[in-house]
Amino acid sequence: PFLFDELFALFGKKREDYVEFLAVEPWYRFEFSDGSKLDYGGSIEDTVSEINRLSPGEGKGYVDLVNFSKRIFKVGFEKLSDQPFHKFWTMVRQVPALLALKSYLSVYRLVSSFLKDARLRRAFSIHPLLVGGNPMNTTSIYCLIHYLERKWGVWFPRGGTGSLVDALVLSLIH
């Protein structure tokens, strides 16, 4: 929600005066073809317990994935997300950091390096799908979302995304 709070603040408004954000719990519920299920969200301890219930011993791989995604987040979100790449050399200077973060791997391949269970690999590779990407060929930089969700949670605007658009329009009119 903080990014929308910042956006509304640019116009001297408070986001909560226009739209309410609700915390989502669980963040995702995965139902697999074998009938098994995984609820993802909450504390990292709850997630590890849920993963180990589904696939004993895989919880450590998930923790390692989140720790790696924090490294990606530090570069991809904190350092680069608000930077213009309008000059070729601006992007070229980022190549060493992006290589160190294995950006040449797809989301699915990076997730697979931490998790062995095929169900978990699919579940924890979904983020590119949310923006129309394919986890099999979208850069692993999108794995930063694992840490982003851990840091800030998953939120939903009451009334759906249309209510968020309406709130932005109203804030501009007033």
Region spans (language model):
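Residues forming anionic-ligand binding surfaces in small-molecule and nucleic-acid pockets
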Residues: 138-149
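Rossmann-like flavin
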Residues: 33-139
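Short polybasic amphipathic segments
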Residues: 27-32
